[in-house]
Swiss-Prot record:
Binds 1 divalent metal cation per subunit. Its EC number is 3.1.3.5. GO terms for molecular function: 3'-nucleotidase activity; 5'-nucleotidase activity; exopolyphosphatase activity; metal ion binding; nucleotide binding. This is 5'-nucleotidase SurE. SUPFAM superfamilies: SurE-like (SSF64167). Pfam families: SurE. It is found in: Cytoplasm. It comes from the Bacteria. Nucleotidase that shows phosphatase activity on nucleoside 5'-monophosphates.
Amino acid sequence: MKPLNILISNDDGVFAAGIRALAKSAQKRGHKVKVVCPDQERSATGHGLTLQSPLRVEKADELFGEGIEAWGCSGTPADCVKLALSELLDNKPDLILSGINHGPNLGTDIFCSGTVAAAMEGTLENVPSMAISVASFKWKNFEAAGEIAMNIAEQAINDSWPASLLLNLNIPPCDKSKIKELSWTRLSVRKYKNQFSKREDPRGDDYYWLAGEVVLDLKSKGYGPKNWPSDVSQIQDNKISLTPVEPDLFWRGDLENLPKINNSFINPS
C-alpha cells in the first residue's frame, strides 16, 4: 500500500515503551510518522480537555529516532490529538493510532481511558482511528503488538474503514505464537468494587487513594450480532479483541420503555 501519514498518541506519556514500539513498527513499513502525546503519564483521564491553563509542547524527536517527528504536550491525550490536528501537523493524517497502552482497555472502562479518548478525538474529526492496548500492566514486549496493530490498521484502511467508526484493539499478554485468533467483539459491562485507601500526609491532612477490584463482567445489551464474544472473554482465551465503537451514545430502544414526560411543571395552571 502507499505510505500513510500517521499520527500517534497515547496516555502513558512520551517516555513509554509502547508508543515507541508502535511508532517504529509504522515507520518500518514506510509510513510517515508524527507523534504528539502527553509529556508524562496521564492514564484514566478520559476525554478531558485543558481549559484553565495553557498547553505547552516540546520537541521529543530524540526519543523516537531518525525520521520520526515528535512532541511532548502538557495536556491530556485528547488535547494532544486536537492540538496536532489544528496546529502542529502540516497535513491531515490518513490514520490516527493511540497506544500501545500498558494495560487493557476493555468494556465500559473505555469511558475512563485516555488512550481511547485520543483515538475518539480523531474519529470525531473524521480520521480513521484505532486505540491499541496490551491487556497487562506488566507485559513489556510491545514489538509483536505493534506488528499486529499495523497489520489490522492497514487491512482496515484497504477495506474502506468508515472514518466515523473507532476501532478498539486489545491484544493478549502472551507470546505471538500463543495467540489464537482475531475476532470482532462486543464491549462488556465492567462492575467494580471501589476501594479508597485513607492516608495521612506529613502535615496531618487526610487524603484518599483510589483502588478498585473487578467483581463482574457482563455482556452488553447493545445492537449488533448476538453471537459476538465479549472483549473480556476474548482476552481471557488468549485471543485478540477488536471492537467497533461509535461516538454516538444515543439510546435506540423503544420509546415505551422510557420514563413518561410530564410538561405540566413548565407552565402550571
